[in-house]
């Protein structure tokens, strides 16, 4: 499977400009033979303009129509990063998954909101894990800060996911965290991690890029720099069975010993 990660500087507050950027890059990936393209977090408006509520996509209709048309016209699967969706008066950080025929397969609202950045003042949190199939391949997606919660990612692995997608808007000062956490989640869950970040700036934020494809051994198969680019790599899902046969952490788990509520 050939996957392209669309790493680009998002234009704050300008949905149409960002639609145009995404369209051109996805078309380029499709022409290069990619089976799938993956977008970063909040690629429609960035993170986030002062008038975000008024600019938000009501029920995600604009983004869904755009992604479905783009996927069908390019015959490419899309992990639609995330967009600002308005629903019942609240805003959600929402991901849409679309197959190569333009059918919406799944959606996800970011569940862990980044309180140091005040996300909880802007967005309402989601309340469910996102696992889905594209073709016959079980997959899952999370969003940015969700990556720091290992138990959340482990739930995706236990649900059978073979690929975890991580759209993000990860800032440059924590680049090392980004690289380590993505590799760690791949190793401990013995699946592929496909993590796409934005680049450029938004206000005081500078995003670190370095979109990555990581195999279940934690080896980086493809990685971008800190600027605009399409990062492309190929994955071979057959290695998952081989790795799990050699070190079977799922067989050796002791869930009866794990008590995760703890103290806040």
Feature-to-residue mapping (PLM):
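Active-site-proximal beta-strand elements of phosphoester/diester hydrolases
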Residues: 1-12, 38, 94, 107, ...
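Hydrophobic residues at beta-strand termini and immediately following loops
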Residues: 6, 55, 108, 132, ...
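Cys-nucleophile CN-hydrolase/nitrilase-fold catalytic domain and related Cys-dependent amidase chemistry
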Residues: 15-16, 23-100, 107, 171-189
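Short beta->alpha transition motifs characteristic of CBS
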Residues: 45, 52, 96, 108-114, ...
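CN hydrolase (nitrilase-like) catalytic-core segments centered on the catalytic cysteine
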Residues: 60-79, 148-234
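Active-site catalytic loop in hydrolytic enzyme cores
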Residues: 86-159, 172-180, 245-249, 259
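Long hydrophobic alpha-helical segments typical of transmembrane helices together
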Residues: 212-262
């Amino acid at each position: 499977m050939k996957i392209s990660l669309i790493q680009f500087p998002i234009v704050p507050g300008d949905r149409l400009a960002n639609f145009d950027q995404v369209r051109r890059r996805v078309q380029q990936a499709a022409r290069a033979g990619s089976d799938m393209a993956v977008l970063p977090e909040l690629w429609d408006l960035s993170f986030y303009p002062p008038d975000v509520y008024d600019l938000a996509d009501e029920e995600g209709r604009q983004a869904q129509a755009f992604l479905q048309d783009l996927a069908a016209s390019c015959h490419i699967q899309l992990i639609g990063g995330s967009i600002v969706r308005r629903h019942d008066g609240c805003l959600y950080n929402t991901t849409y998954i679309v197959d190569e025929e333009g059918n919406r397969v799944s959606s996800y609202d970011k569940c862990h909101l980044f309180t140091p950045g005040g996300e909880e003042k802007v967005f309402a949190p989601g309340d469910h894990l996102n696992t889905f199939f594209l073709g016959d391949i079980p997959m899952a997606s999370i969003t940015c800060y969700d990556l720091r919660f290992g138990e959340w990612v482990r739930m995706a692995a236990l649900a059978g996911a073979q690929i975890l997608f991580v759209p993000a808007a990860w800032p440059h000062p924590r680049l090392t965290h980004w690289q380590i956490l993505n590799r760690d989640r791949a190793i401990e869950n013995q699946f592929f991690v496909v993590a796409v970040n934005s680049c450029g700036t938004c206000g005081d934020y500078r995003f670190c890029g370095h979109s990555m494809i990581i195999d279940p051994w934690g080896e980086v198969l493809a990685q971008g720099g800190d600027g605009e680019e399409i990062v492309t790599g190929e994955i071979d899902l057959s290695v998952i069975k081989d790795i799990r046969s050699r070190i079977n952490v799922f067989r050796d788990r002791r869930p009866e010993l794990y008590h995760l509520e703890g103290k806040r």
